[in-house]
Curated annotation (Swiss-Prot):
CDD domains: MPN_DUF2466 (cd08071). It comes from Shewanella oneidensis (strain ATCC 700550 / JCM 31522 / CIP 106686 / LMG 19005 / NCIMB 14063 / MR-1). Zn(2+) binds at H173, H175, D186. One of its GO terms (molecular function) is metal ion binding. Belongs to the UPF0758 family. The keyword Repeat does not apply. Transmembrane segments: none annotated. This is UPF0758 protein SO_4248. It holds the Pfam family UPF0758_N.
Amino acid sequence: MAIKDWPEGEGPRDKLLLKGASHLSDAELLAVLLRNGLSGLNAVDLARSLIQEFGGLRSLLCAPKHQVCRLPGVGPVKYAQLQAAAELARRVAQENLQRGQVLTNPDLTRDYLMRQLADRSYEVFAILLLDSQHRVIQFVELFRGTIDSASVYPREVVSLVLEKKAAAVIVCHNHPSGIAEPSQADRRITERLKNALATIDVSLLDHMVVGDREIVSFAERGWIN
């Protein structure tokens, strides 16, 4: 049945306006973004099929364009709408960790990094620059692609730290596989960065590895002394 034929107030857009977005299911929220379905499949049914196809919202939003657009009812326009929504969510998270904010709550840092990196289909190595009071200076994405000990250059990290006058840093990267367990290469990178930063008297507070639903902290495991 087409959504326009549903009882008044039951369509996803009407329900959102009447009750608020929190009252909508994942499929209903996605349907609001998609706006319409295709022949024989309304927007909610299309949204539900997309979520099922990719195994969840996060996997759908981080899927590459060719994987999404190959499905019936989803073209470049709908793909662009989904990507815009995902980017807005990341930017909201970025505003929550504003310049000058003191990182006294580890959960805030985890939530921020999860929103920034968990939905990427490629590896990103980034750095959170802090001042001597552990206030945020800037979050910077440094490297993209396959992250290993050969592709992360300590001198570039040191150069950025000096440029921004940071006193401490948290480095982080994601695992597109969704598994946050650090590799031996991750541990080697961390040791090289810690030693390089020590030469300019800057503390490496942590290296966080972001998976689909968890973050592994090197500091919590005692791997950064």
